[in-house]
Every structure is written in C-alpha cells, then in structure tokens.
Regions:
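Phosphate/nucleotide-binding beta-alpha loop and adjacent structural elements of enzyme active sites
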Residues: 1-135
C-alpha cells in the first residue's frame, strides 16, 4: 500500500502542472495530514476548531496555498471566507488557486483607520510584504 501511495504522489508531482490548487487537492486526498501553513499551524487550527462550515478572513493570503492557514479548513471542513492579498502578481496566483465560488478574493492592503494617505506603497520579498510609505 505504501508503494502504491508513493507512486501516486510521484505521478501527481511529475505529471500534473503546478496549478497549486488542483495539485494540492489531489495530494491532500492521498496525504490528508499535509501541512499548508507554516510549522503546521493550519493543522493545529483544524484540530482546535471543530466547527464545520465556518467563516474565515485571511489577511496576506499569498497565493492561497503557500503557508495558508485556511486552505485545510476549506478543503476538509467546508469553510469559506475572505482572502486578502495586496501584491498584484501574487493575487493573480491566488485567483487561480482558490475557489471564487466559495470565497471572496480581494486585492487590497489593510491599514489602520487613522491612516491618512491615499495609497500604501509595498515592497514584496517572497512571503513578506513591507509598507514603505508609513511613517
């Protein structure tokens, strides 16, 4: 059985294009214990939060898969929510990777209510965005 599972994982990784959401769903069916979040945070959240069909808001959603703390809730517990990502090219990947039928996707930066500028300039470096025009 382990050999069949390993072979299936190998086939998925080598023959299915890197459309993360499709590939991740297939891998998740074979390896349901796969962590998407950093250091298994998504798995711990799924264990603590027992509710089915809940609602989430993820600020800094990235591509919707990489270090996602909500994808596991969506795939295995039927959750839906709002995913917010400020970086345009990363947001484009988010739209491909996460279901718009289940979630609302928004390209926006989140700032405090007392932020007095018209826009936020952001520097993007891998998984971290840093605002540049905040005093």
């Amino acid at each position: 059985m382990a050999t069949v599972r390993a072979h299936a994982i190998h086939l998925i990784r080598t023959h299915i294009p890197r459309t993360w959401f499709t590939r991740s769903r297939l891998l998740a069916k074979i390896k349901p214990n796969r962590d998407f979040g950093l250091d298994g945070l998504d798995t711990r959240l799924a264990e603590i939060v027992q509710k089915e069909r809940g609602f989430f808001i993820e600020l800094g959603a990235n591509d919707g898969v990489t270090q996602s703390n909500t994808l596991k809730l969506e795939l295995f517990k039927g959750w839906k929510g709002v995913l917010i990502e400020p970086v345009p090219r990363v947001f484009a990947r988010l739209k491909k990777n996460r279901s718009r039928q289940r979630n609302h996707l928004e390209m926006a930066a989140c700032v405090s209510f007392d932020f007095d500028k018209d826009y936020v300039e952001i520097a993007f470096s891998n998984l971290m965005s840093t605002p540049l025009n905040i005093d």
